């Protein structure tokens, strides 16, 4: 596995969760996954997702965000 390449990092305004996204490249087989890491205090939740799932998840989040314009963060 190659080193993780940072994609994005931000903090959720309301809950304070820290979200990090990294690209994970696996040399054997050419597999690339997006690692989403959510930190809530001392607890971590980690998802490794494939490109198709990332697109589906991202599109769903964009659609929801666009349907709530002007909402406070």
Language model features with spans:
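Positively charged, low-complexity terminal tracts
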Residues: 1-73
């Amino acid at each position: 596995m190659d080193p993780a390449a940072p994609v994005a990092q931000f903090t959720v305004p309301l809950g304070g969760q820290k979200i990090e996204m990294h690209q994970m490249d696996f040399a054997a087989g050419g597999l690339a996954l997006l690692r989403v890491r959510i930190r809530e205090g001392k607890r971590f939740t980690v998802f490794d997702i494939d490109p198709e799932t990332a697109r589906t998840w991202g599109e769903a989040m964009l659609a929801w965000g666009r349907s709530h314009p002007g909402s406070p963060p």
